[in-house]
Swiss-Prot record:
The keyword Oxidoreductase does not apply. Binds 3 Mg(2+) or Mn(2+) ions per subunit. Monoterpene synthase involved in the biosynthesis of (E)-beta-ocimene as the major product and trace amounts of (Z)-beta-ocimene. Can only accept geranyl diphosphate as substrate. (2E)-geranyl diphosphate binds at residues 307, 344, 348, 485, 488. PANTHER family: OS04G0344100 PROTEIN-RELATED, TERPENE SYNTHASE 12-RELATED. Highly expressed in leaves, stems and disk florets. Detected in roots. Belongs to the terpene synthase family. Tpsb subfamily. Keywords: Chloroplast, Lyase, Magnesium, Manganese, Metal-binding, Plastid, Transit peptide. Pathway: Secondary metabolite biosynthesis; terpenoid biosynthesis. It catalyses: (2E)-geranyl diphosphate = (E)-beta-ocimene + diphosphate. Its main location: plastid. This is (E)-beta-ocimene synthase, chloroplastic. It is found in: Plastid, Chloroplast.
Length: 596
């Protein structure tokens, strides 16, 4: 029954893709109109008019990127990988301490090499997690030799790595953490370890909050230190804590920083540099593939009011899932992100309220016949969405025998319902309560759409009860989406926070509580910290049911949100920092001339 149903959907998808191309040709000279409900006037939007700045990354530029870095490097990479893997065997043979192992794992993850050593790391972390925590994870013969500062560093590092890996850290462990704080001396390694560990706290752990305040205060005093290396590390940590950083950006920065260390492991560093370039080359190939798709849709040429943000959307998908083996997930998530951006622009800046209602209901019903009642620009948007999702569904059905289209269509319908609520608020000049706003806004930010598609794209063994399985991870996805929303709203410029414009978290809080913008922003920052705690708890709860790549994808959504909205809206108005970040992780490779 499911196969018969999908064959019909697949046929419709093929037919209506042809319809989309025909419509694009017919509408080559189309001028779009935006209705102003208040005055009943029609404003013409011509192709020469652009609401948003043009893309910095053209299709021709992307198509010309070099992608052949791996040639003649496989043998060297394999040799280095084997040598690094031996370090884990050294630990299991008793040749290195727990502290040395934890520092190795920390370096591997920060250098972007975690995807190569997942099995090795899980095996030894399982062992460490079962060690009597009263020993602080140190071998008995080492305890007398380790200085207090090193013990505190080891304690913090162990806590952070175990918790970020999904292990439950006992209350007894935290009690020892509290007792050890009395021996804090303020050394940089110790302070940084305490600081980074404190950002893995859960609700009801005030001792870690106090440790965060202490370490932050001490680190702030070192920001003007004459030692440039020390100052760089301190400023980097205070900018965004490690657990909240986008993984590829951290890898790029840490490879440079690690290379300046006198104690750097040369083989580990060489592997990190080669691996970064190899992964980057894979990303370039993915980007070229999705760029051809985006060019083929013709949406940018025909809908002159939308943002052309393919590169930024690809950057976003790399932030969510960078590992080379998940190339299909990365490419398809980029398509989803560009469609979300396109449809968001339709709801935000172009469509009339009545037209948006028609579009929303059509998507909720997944009804291709509804296009007959739409204006041309909505037909283009609907058909692009319909064909793309049906094609994804076809690939999953072909490979695994499961029809996921109803699941994907459902989350799209829910997203557009949330879009419509916001459009109605704006149309009616209505300012919702802060609670009502957030209840809708964590859905309208599109995190659930991205994560649901990612779930099916990454999951190689989709079952008939996939939708029920998704519900088990609702909290993880919800808090990741909430962080996405809060970071987005925090990026709003002062002149955008206006009661007469679309509500956001800051304007709603200001209006409801009669407070200043500064007070509202501080409240949102507090909610961000609480949401991270909620998400970490949800991550731990999911560890027993969900594979690590899926959990990581949800956490990475929050991380890339933190990055893209750090200096403003990096999607709406890409500026110099966004361009530099794209260059650093997608375009510009490391120099490997000194690696034999």
């Amino acid at each position: 029954m499911a196969i018969t149903h999908y064959q019909m959907a697949s046929f419709q998808s093929s037919f209506h893709f042809c319809m989309l191309r025909k419509t694009l040709r017919q509408k080559s000279s189309l001028h779009f109109a935006k209705r102003c409900e208040a005055t009943n006037k029609i404003f013409q939007t011509h192709g020469s008019v652009a609401i948003y700045q043009k893309t910095l990354w053209t299709h021709d530029l992307i198509d010309g990127l070099e992608t052949d870095f791996l040639i003649n490097r496989k043998e060297k990479v394999n040799e280095l990988e084997v040598n690094v893997a031996r370090m884990f065997m050294d630990y299991e043979n008793g040749d290195i301490s727990n502290l040395e192992l934890l520092e190795l794992i920390d370096n591997i993850e920060r250098l972007g090499l975690g995807h190569r050593f997942q099995t090795n790391m899980k095996r030894v972390l399982d062992k460490i997690a079962t060690v009597n925590e009263n020993s602080l994870g140190l071998k008995e013969e080492e305890e007398e030799e380790e200085e207090e500062e090193d013990n505190l560093h080891a304690l913090s590092l162990k806590f952070r790595i175990l918790r970020q890996s999904g292990y439950r850290v006992s209350q007894d462990f935290q009690r020892k953490f509290k007792e050890s704080r009395g021996g804090l001396t303020g050394g940089l390694k110790e302070l940084l370890s305490i600081y980074e560990a404190s950002y893995l706290s859960l609700e009801g752990e005030p001792d870690l909050h106090e440790a965060k305040l202490f370490a932050t205060e001490k680190l702030l005093k070192l920001t003007g230190h004459e030692n440039e290396a020390m100052k760089d590390h301190v400023n980097h940590a205070l900018d965004i804590p490690l657990y909240r950083r986008m993984l590829r950006l951290e890898a790029r920065w840490y490879i440079d920083a690690y290379g300046k260390r006198k104690d750097a492991n040369k083989q580990l560093l060489e592997l990190a540099i080669l691996d970064f370039n190899i992964v980057q080359s894979a990303h370039k190939r993915d980007l070229q593939e999705v760029s051809k798709w985006w060019e083929k849709t013709g949406l940018v040429r025909k809908l002159d009011f939308i943002r052309d943000r393919l590169m930024e959307c690809f950057f976003w998908s790399v932030g969510m899932v960078f590992e080379p083996q998940y190339y299909t997930c990365r490419v398809e998530l980029t398509k989803i992100a560009t469609l979300i951006t396109t449809i968001d622009d339709i709801y935000d800046v172009y469509g009339s309220l009545n037209e948006l209602k028609v579009f929303t209901h059509a998507v909720k019903r997944w009804d291709i016949n509804a296009v007959e009642n739409m204006p041309e620009y909505l037909q283009l948007g609907f058909l692009a969405l319909y064909n793309t999702i049906n094609e994804m569904g076809y690939e999953t059905l072909s490979a695994q025998g499961i029809n996921i289209i109803p699941n994907l269509a459902r989350v799209w319908g829910e997203l557009l319902e949330a879009f419509l609520v916001e459009a109605e608020w704006t149309h009616n000049n209505y300012m919702p309560t802060f609670k009502d706003y957030l209840d809708n806004a964590w859905r309208s930010v599109s995190g659930m759409v991205l994560l649901t598609h990612g779930y099916f794209l990454m999951n190689q063994d989709v079952k008939d009860d996939a939708i029920e399985s998704l519900e088990n991870f609702h909290d993880l996805f919800k808090w990741s989406s909430m962080l996405f929303r809060l970071y987005n709203d925090l990026a709003a410029l002062a002149d955008e926070i206006d009661k007469d414009k679309s509500p956001n978290a800051i304007s709603c809080y200001m209006y409801e509580h009669s407070v200043s913008e500064e007070v509202a922003r501080e409240h949102v920052k507090t909610l961000i910290d609480k949401a991270w705690m909620k998400m970490i708890e949800a991550r731990i709860a999911c560890s027993e049911h969900m594979t690590d790549p899926l959990i990581d994808m949800a956490i990475n959504l929050a991380r890339v949100s933190s990055c893209m909205y750090q200096y403003g809206d990096g999607i709406k108005d890409p500026e110099a920092r966004t361009k530099d970040r794209v260059m650093s992780i997608i375009i510009k490779p490391f120099d490997t001339s000194e690696i034999p």
